[in-house]
């Protein structure tokens, strides 16, 4: 209120946090700042006498068993990680937070400093469950410079669309800024530093089960193909506009180099087309004079050289002739064995695990009925597997769909993955982004509250299965797993083969 008891409106226009304590760029010596691409979203930065690594995913799958590395990492990747002075991990998705990779690193350097943003869902929420022994994880506030030495500092910023989990980073060395927006949909709400020395971002698309894993209604192969084509083009145009607006000296498309290489995901691999980084680079060059760099594993960009003379032949050093660029084999078995270990777990001998799990999950008071069906590799019902309904309005488990009007979804999940997720209390991104489900829904509506809960808001500790099994022992003999037979599908809200509006 003002002095006349009137309402006083103030428009807040705070300064950009990276403009606080500004530092003028100093000339860089050749070789002083070098950025080496390892694979996917992993970069190895030499910054004077310090080394910093982004998002190390170098071995194993991401999202259960759905994503595998497209590029062959340099053979010295583990040495590079061990020599790092600090590591930045942008968010909790397993193509950025790779526990198989970190397990290798922790075996050599458990105390390596790792920095993450102070997100609502902690990046390392599942560290204890993972069994990885890391002892120097640092959670830092957003928008505040973190000083590494007199020449090097960094600042972590949140995403404007997914602030609960996504972050990006500004690294500054002797006044030269490197902006890595990673997977952020709207990094820092759209406010970002302009004319940085180097900017890098994702570009590929395809990091979702939609629409490839959907069927029924409008989800014909023709509709999916057109949707994917349109969405990929929209993403390319958005990235090109962002680069044009921010005017970095150099732009690098990365964080999109994955492939659905397991034979069981052949359909996804063929359907889920991704953007070509060179197409994005050509689009950028049409509208600006920004230098673009499409990296190959082991390629190194010398920032000092490139800023001084963009035509310098030594500005970008490609890997030696004959270096293997693309992976042609993946070690599937050790990771599939981990998933398969959940199949015969004692938990699933008791049908009451269903109520135990969904009560633990804590999602209810929402008018949605979901049918969960365990399947084999090819999404056919798994022999002896579970097939059940969950009514989230009152969190009940009826044998038939309720008579009231209700949205309905069917989620077919590969049995090894869904049981691994249930047993360990993991987020459903393992299923959805990992292409481990097939879905139908009626009506064709995205239930944000449901999916957001299971993808980001599940409890931070897994279900107490030890206590559950003790109760089962006290309450009587084992109830063998069952399959709910539904030979006559209910007519209510039955899926139509016609397209839905």
Curated annotation (Swiss-Prot):
Entry keywords, A to Z: Cytoplasm
InterPro entries, per the entry: Cnh, RibonucZ/Hydroxyglut_hydro
Gene Ontology terms for molecular function: CMP-N-acetylneuraminate monooxygenase activity
Compartments it resides in: Cytoplasm
Keyword Cytoplasm appears in the UniProt entry: yes
Coiled coil feature spans: none
Gene Ontology cellular component terms for the protein in this record: cytoplasm; cytoskeleton; membrane; nucleus
One GO BP: CMP-N-acetylneuraminate metabolic process
One of the Pfam families matching this protein, by short name: Lactamase_B_3
Keyword Cytoplasm: yes
Expression across tissues: Widely expressed. Highly expressed in thymus. Not expressed in brain. May be expressed in adult stem cells (at protein level).
Signal peptide: none
Stated role: Sialic acids are components of carbohydrate chains of glycoconjugates and are involved in cell-cell recognition and cell-pathogen interactions. That protein has no CMP-N-acetylneuraminate monooxygenase activity and is not able to convert CMP-N-acetylneuraminic acid (CMP-Neu5Ac) into its hydroxylated derivative CMP-N-glycolylneuraminic acid (CMP-Neu5Gc), a sialic acid abundantly expressed at the surface of many cells in vertebrates. However, it may play a role in Wnt signaling.
Family: Belongs to the CMP-Neu5Ac hydroxylase family.
Official protein name in the record: Inactive cytidine monophosphate-N-acetylneuraminic acid hydroxylase
Organism: Homo sapiens (Human)
Source lineage: Eukaryota, Metazoa, Chordata, Craniata, Vertebrata
């Amino acid at each position: 209120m003002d002095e006349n008891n009137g309402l006083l409106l103030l428009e807040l226009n705070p300064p950009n946090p990276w403009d606080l304590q500004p530092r003028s760029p100093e000339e860089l010596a050749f070789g002083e700042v070098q950025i080496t691409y390892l694979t996917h979203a992993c970069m190895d930065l030499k910054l004077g006498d310090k080394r910093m690594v982004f998002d190390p995913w170098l071995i194993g799958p991401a999202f259960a068993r759905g994503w595998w590395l497209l590029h062959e990492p340099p053979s010295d990747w583990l040495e590079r990680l061990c020599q790092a002075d600090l590591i930045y991990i942008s968010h909790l998705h397993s193509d950025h937070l790779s526990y198989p990779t970190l397990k290798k690193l922790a075996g050599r350097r458990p105390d390596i400093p790792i920095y993450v943003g102070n997100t609502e869902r902690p990046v390392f929420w599942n560290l204890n469950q993972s069994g990885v022994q890391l002892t120097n994880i640092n959670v830092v506030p957003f928008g505040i410079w973190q000083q590494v030495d007199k020449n090097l500092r960094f600042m972590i910023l949140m995403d404007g669309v997914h602030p609960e989990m996504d972050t990006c980073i500004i690294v500054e060395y002797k006044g030269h800024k490197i902006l890595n927006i990673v997977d952020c949909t709207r990094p820092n709400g759209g406010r970002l530093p302009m004319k940085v020395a180097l900017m890098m971002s994702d570009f590929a698309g395809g990091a979702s089960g939609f629409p490839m894993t959907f069927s029924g209604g409008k989800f014909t192969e023709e509709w999916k193909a057109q949707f994917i084509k349109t969405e990929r083009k929209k993403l390319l145009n958005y990235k090109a506009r962002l680069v044009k607006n921010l005017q970095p000296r150099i732009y690098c498309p990365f964080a999109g180099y994955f492939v659905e290489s397991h034979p069981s995901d052949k359909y996804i691999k063929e359907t889920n087309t991704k953007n070509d980084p060179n197409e994005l680079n050509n689009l950028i060059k049409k509208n600006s004079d920004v230098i673009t760099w499409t990296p190959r594993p082991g390629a190194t960009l010398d920032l000092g050289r490139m800023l001084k003379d963009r035509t310098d032949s030594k500005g970008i050093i490609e890997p030696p002739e004959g270096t293997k660029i693309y992976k042609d084999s993946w070690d599937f078995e050790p990771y599939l064995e981990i998933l398969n270990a959940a199949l015969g777990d004692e938990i699933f001998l008791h049908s009451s695990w269903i109520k135990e799990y969904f009560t633990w999950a804590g999602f209810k008071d929402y008018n949605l009925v979901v049918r969960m069906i365990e399947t084999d590799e090819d999404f056919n019902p798994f022999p002896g597997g579970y097939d059940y309904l969950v009514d989230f309005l009152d969190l009940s488990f009826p044998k038939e769909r309720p008579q009231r009007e209700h949205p309905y979804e069917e989620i077919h999940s590969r049995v090894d993955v869904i049981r691994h997720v249930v047993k360990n209390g993991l987020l459903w991104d393992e299923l959805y982004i990992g292409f481990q489900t097939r879905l139908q829904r009626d009506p064709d509506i995205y239930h944000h509250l449901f999916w957001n809960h299971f993808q980001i808001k599940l409890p931070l500790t897994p279900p107490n299965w030890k206590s559950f099994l003790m109760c089962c022992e006290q309450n009587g003999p084992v109830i063998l797993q069952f399959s709910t037979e539904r030979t006559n599908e209910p007519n209510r809200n039955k899926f139509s083969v016609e397209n839905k509006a």
